[in-house]
Amino acid sequence: MKKILFLFVLGFGLIAFSACTSNPANQEAPIGENSNNPVDTAINNEVAPVLIDGSYVVDVNASQMTWHASRVVASDHTGLIQIKNGNLDVSEGNLMGANFIIDMNSISSDEGLDALVGHLKSEDFFDVANYPEAFLEINNVTYLDGAYQITADLGIKGAVSSITFPAQITTEADRLLATAAFSIDRTVWDIRYGSGKFFEDLGDKTIKDEIDFTIQLEAQRQ
């Protein structure tokens, strides 16, 4: 679990997704479909670092995405998810847009819990048989309080919703490095298993709705 972060984090009972999301749109969307609308890039009275212009391709072997989820009582789980591919565009020194495909079938457990991994892949959670990929598409970038503020569409299980999170992004020669962290409310993406919002009398088997993700990205300029 490694370098430029746009994480994505997911969990047991998985499951926790802290409401950074808005406008849930339970609409089927082609995985990783890019919109043709230009990304809104604004620099709010702060001078953003000047990035090196170019098209960057994510180095999936040098990048890492982690997830963390827990029950309401005493049970925390963490693991990795593989970024399948990704692209970032920098123009006039600013990040103009990016998109990433996430391999949901690659979900793993740091504890090596095969039963947990199997459950996360099942229909109760990510239903990877029918939805093997998720996507993150950046459509708005601002710079505030020493960090890039990223707004992106996150697609999981055919549902798409907007999330906003801070990120650190730098370029060095032909490399782009990024780190990010965000939380989501999994129920927005119709992942309801063990949620106290939808089921009563779960007691200590209740799984938190929030899932935390971290991303460390490294990308190569083409």
What residue spans do the PLM features occupy?
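Low-complexity, acidic/polar, glycine-enriched regions of mature
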Residues: 20-222
